[in-house]
Regions:
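A structural signal for short, hydrophobic/glycine-enriched beta-strand patches
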Residues: 118, 122-123, 138, 144, ...
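Extended hydrophobic blocks
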Residues: 1-156, 253-254, 258-328
Length: 328
């Protein structure tokens, strides 16, 4: 296991330096932690101080964590629905929390488990469903880890351009969410003398001006010189933010992408696909909103990589079926 840990550690450092805008950053970090944990197992005896410091918290996290996370999702979903309205997109954290509770109930409720075990067709459906749940849970862990690493351990780099991504308007004014992105973008711009601010965002059907124009007006009020602001007002989604902004950027110039924390990793993966030399900064948002929005971003990432996700799941499902056939 120590060799697996060293291999994962070396690969993790390599990915961190060479190309961190990938899910492999999260995969390697998780494998590194798991292999380090496994390497320590033979050396820690129960009871001992190291057992209580290392293993007991992990055991508690694995046993209580799923229930706590499900309840947290439900609590934050009620906050979101109360403060932001009952739109379908605001029910994602509620659905995740409720689904988590139902799965925990099916595992812990003896009569339900026995009912499923004695009906072969139901057991097959339940097994397939749980394989999907396990797969997407692991993917969510990798996605979350890669996201956190991309906005918490950003190497300080020189940016020639600071690209701020739009996020909807209130009439012709920026929302608090969008204002936080612009404020963060201005902060990054001020730390990079000679850089240009790119405001990227199109005009929705219910908006009187484009997001980019409203963002520009906000930045001007904050004291940013007009000659340092570039407007890109054709984009309708994150991929178009990258694609259309690229035409305004000198080839090979380093770009700092600024968006909300929950949106940053997927934005960086799209920037990589559009061959932008980029790194990212996250703007703060309220946690009740971030949790639901992060789930939406995860779904967006799954759709963005759907071919690879389907292929990977089918391979793992086949491996599981072969294993069950050989050892059952």
């Amino acid at each position: 296991m120590i060799y697996l840990f060293l291999s994962c550690f070396i690969l993790f450092i390599g990915v961190s330096v060479w190309e961190r805008r990938t899910i492999w950053l999260g995969i390697l970090f998780c494998l590194m932690l798991a292999s380090a944990f496994a390497s320590l197992l033979p050396f820690i005896q129960y009871p001992s101080l190291w057992f209580y410091l290392i293993f007991l918290p992990i055991i508690l996290l694995l046993s209580v964590g799923p229930l706590g996370f499900a309840l947290l999702c439900l609590y934050k979903s009620f906050q979101l629905l109360y403060k932001e309205g009952r739109r379908w997109s605001n029910f994602l954290s509620f659905a995740l929390g409720l689904g988590g509770l139902l799965i925990i109930f099916s595992y812990s409720h003896t009569e339900t488990a026995d009912y499923i075990q004695h009906r072969s067709w139901l057991l097959a459906v339940y097994t397939a469903f749980m394989l999907l749940v396990f797969y997407f849970t692991v993917q969510l862990i990798f996605f979350t880890t890669a996201s956190v690493l991309n906005f918490t351990f950003t190497f300080v780099k020189k940016a020639d351009y600071v690209l701020v991504l739009g996020a909807g308007l209130l009439g012709d004014r920026v929302t608090p969410l969008l204002a936080s992105r612009i404020d963060k973008g201005i902060s990054v711009y001020q730390k990079n003398p000679g850089s240009k601010l790119i405001m990227s965002g199109g005009q929705g059907s219910d908006e009187s001006v484009s997001e980019a124009e409203a963002m520009r007006n906000y930045a001007l009020k904050q004291g940013v010189p007009s000659q340092d602001i570039i407007v890109e007002k054709q984009s309708r989604n994150t991929r178009e933010n990258m694609r259309f902004s690229k035409t305004l950027i000198k080839d090979g110039a380093p770009v700092a992408i600024v968006t909300s924390y929950y949106h940053l990793f997927r934005a960086l993966t799209l920037a990589r696909q559009e061959k932008l030399k980029s790194f990212g900064y996250g703007a703060k948002t309220r946690f009740y909103f971030t949790l639901n929005a992060f789930i939406r971003e995860f779904i967006g990432y799954l759709m963005q990589t759907k071919k690879w996700q389907l292929l990977t799941f089918l391979i793992l499902a086949c491996c599981y079926c072969i294993f069950r056939y050989l050892f059952n």
